[in-house]
């Protein structure tokens, strides 16, 4: 099992991730992103700019219920990769199976969102001192 340990800022829980195309499992081309960990989200999401830079094909708009209400947003297939503690930039990330996720609208604090589709494959813990731990693999 691999793990990531970090501290959150007291307002939101974010961590670095890598976003990859889902159409070819041998294509390890990625974009770095900062992901919000959201236990209230059913599915994961990526910023529209990431989808465009990776050349992801839209799967159409679908309804999305969020804290801001009901809206319609583009859907994409993508993969999320996590770099375990102790790995260097030359290491390969742990890559989860493809997600059927949604397009985020611009946030200045994060460019991806990790929802329960990914978190249910992990052990996630947070303590009173703002330390977070994510175990996966």
Regions found by a protein language model. Give the residues of each.
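Pepsin/retropepsin-fold aspartyl endopeptidases
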Residues: 1-137
């Amino acid at each position: 099992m691999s793990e990531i340990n970090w501290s959150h800022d007291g307002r939101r829980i974010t961590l670095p991730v890598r976003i990859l195309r889902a159409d070819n499992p041998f294509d390890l081309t990625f974009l770095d992103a900062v992901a919000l960990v959201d236990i209230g989200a059913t599915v994961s999401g990526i910023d529209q700019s990431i989808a465009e830079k990776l050349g992801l094909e839209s799967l159409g708009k679908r309804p999305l219920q969020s804290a801001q209400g009901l809206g319609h947003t583009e859907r994409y297939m993508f993969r999320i990769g996590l770099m375990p503690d102790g790995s260097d930039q030359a290491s390969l990330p742990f890559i989860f199976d493809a997600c059927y996720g949604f397009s985020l609208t611009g946030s200045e604090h994060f460019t991806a969102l990790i929802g329960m589709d990914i978190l249910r494959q992990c052990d996630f813990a947070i303590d009173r001192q703002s330390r977070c731990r994510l175990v996966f693999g």
